[in-house]
Structure formats: C-alpha cells, structure tokens
Amino acid sequence: MSLGAADVGAGAGPPGQHAGAVDNWPVAIIGSGVVGTDLMSRIGNGDGRLRVSAMVGTNPHCDGLARAAAAGISTSPGGVDGLLSMPEFANIRLVFDTTNPGAHQSNWARLADTGVRMLDLTASAIGPCCVPAVNLDAQLDAPNLSMATCSAQAAVPIVAAVRRHGVVRYAEVVSAIASQALGPAERVTLDEFAELTTTAVQELGGARRAKTLTIVNPADPPMPMRTTVFCLVDQADEVARNEADVLAVVDGVQALLPGYRLKHRVQFERLGSGNTLYIPGTGEFGGTRITVLLEITAAGGYLPACAGNVAIVTSAAKATAEAIVERHAQTLKAKI
C-alpha cells in the first residue's frame, strides 16, 4: 500500500500543554503497520487527551516503528511481551490493538490482568462492539472494547437514524473498498468482517434482518471507500424527519472523520401494489426504500485518500479513547 508522509506527532506536546485538555492519558499501540501508524498520527494531531508513550510491533524495520522513534515515542519489535518489559508500561492507561483477531486473543490474555483498558481494532469481538456515533456511552466501562468494522462504522449510524421513525424490516450494506487499501490479512477475512457488520447493523442499528456485501474495487487510480445503505421501512410518513436525522448523523460522524460524507441526497422510493420487493426469509415488502450513498476518504492522518476503510476505524477508536478519558475525569470530579 502506498502511504503518505504525514508527520507523526505533529501538534503534540507535553502533558497539560493543550488548552482545555481534560486529562493526559499515556497510551500504547500494539501493531506498527498501516492501522497502528495512522492511529499514532491521529492521536499526535489530537487535542492532548491522549499521548502515545509506546508502540510495539514484530518487524524491527517497519516504517511505523521508525516514525514512532523519530517522534520520541518508545518502541519495541517484541510485540506484547516487548510492551510488558518496557519501563513506560507502568504508566500506560489504555492499549490499542491494531494487529489481527488471532493475535488479539493472545495479546488480551497477556494484558487482561494488568488493569489496562483495551481498544480492539481487529474486530475479534472479544469485548462489546462499539460504534461511537450510536452506542458510545453504553460501552465506556468495558475493559476490552471492540471497534466495529469499517462498513459498520459507516452504515450503523444511518440505519439507527432511519429506525427512529419506523421499523427497518431489512437493511443491506454494500461497501466498495479500493484494492490498494486492503492488505493480505483483510482480504482473507472479508467474509468474517461481513458477518460482523451484519450483526452490528441488526443489534446496534436496529434492523430486523440485514445483509452485507464487500466489493474489492480494482480501479487505478484508486477510488475512496463507498458505502451504500438500503433500508426497507414499513411506513413512509416521516420522510422529512428521516432525511433530517440522516443528515444529522452524517454531521456527527464527519466530526470524527472529515472525509465521511453523503455522495448524493437521501433517496426515498415508495413500494406498494404492483411494485413490491421480495425479501428472502421474510416475503413481499411494501413500504419505503431509503437509499443512502456515502463516500469515506482518509482525511487528516497517515493514509492515502483511498483508505477510508482504515481511517474510519482509527478515527472511531481515537474518539472512543477520548470519551473514556472524559468519563474518567467526570468520575474523579464527582468524588471530590
């Protein structure tokens, strides 16, 4: 994957330097590949509530560890064992795992008894699933929190918004992701990620039934990630409010990732007699089909623009960690 040359750590400073910072949590990143490096960049460009104190990987020659070292961050090629042996670990409050589902199980087994919080970007689903735009507050106390897949981060807020004004009988999510933005590990787990996305659309988005499709887009030059969300809704009396709620959640996600946007206006199609749809396992459907077309560009980090699939997860993880810091500060304040 061809990566940009954004400066890691730009805008970061010593604890307390950032005006209005609630706290300054030392965090560690496991995984020095594309995901970990983008996350490090986003934290470095953040408001100071988080500070990357350590990054570990397994390749001593990778770009991520080199960038971390250049930014003054302690590094180790020893993986989770290397992290545990670093003097900085004594002060680490939260660990991001950007490796893969199998490695995450081993990493969590090593860290679970240390008292650190874990944000899982591997979609291993050991902990509860989190889409910050939908269920952030309900999950902040979990010791291990699993960030939903890129397609779920994009689509679940839309489905949840539509669900406010009617029963979503069926939702379908179709994501096209640039071939250049998918590494070997992601390619072999596309089916697993689709299942996790479908589960999130139903459990967090509120759809009765759902389906997820992921298309690898071979276009060159590469295109940004595009996600289309179809919702079949029973009633159609709330078109204006549905559109307003969709626009509001797009604005909310856009605050986390500026590259998240509507590609076209929200589309509404009434389905009735002579114009019904057949849903396998459900039967004929008459009501309203709502279509939302999204484009997700990797803005503001280490990645090329086409890698919105990575950026939306790292941005969600950063926002979740910042909310954990905020919750911790509020809890301490309440005890004073």
Swiss-Prot record:
Record's keyword annotation contains NAD: yes
GO biological process: catabolic process
InterPro entries for the chain: Acetaldehyde_dehydrogenase, Acetylaldehyde_DH_C, NAD(P)-bd_dom_sf, Semialdehyde_DH_NAD-bd
Catalytic residues in the record: C150 (acyl-thioester intermediate)
Enzyme nomenclature, EC number: 1.2.1.10
Catalytic activity: acetaldehyde + NAD(+) + CoA = acetyl-CoA + NADH + H(+)
Enzyme class: oxidoreductase
Keyword entries, A-Z: Aromatic hydrocarbons catabolism, NAD, Oxidoreductase
GO molecular function: acetaldehyde dehydrogenase (acetylating) activity; NAD binding
SUPFAM superfamilies, per the entry: Glyceraldehyde-3-phosphate dehydrogenase-like, C-terminal domain (SSF55347), NAD(P)-binding Rossmann-fold domains (SSF51735)
CDD domains, per database record: ALDH_C
Residues holding NAD(+): S32, G33, V34, V35, N309
Pfam families: AcetDehyd-dimer
Family named by the database record: Belongs to the acetaldehyde dehydrogenase family.
Name of the protein: Acetaldehyde dehydrogenase 1
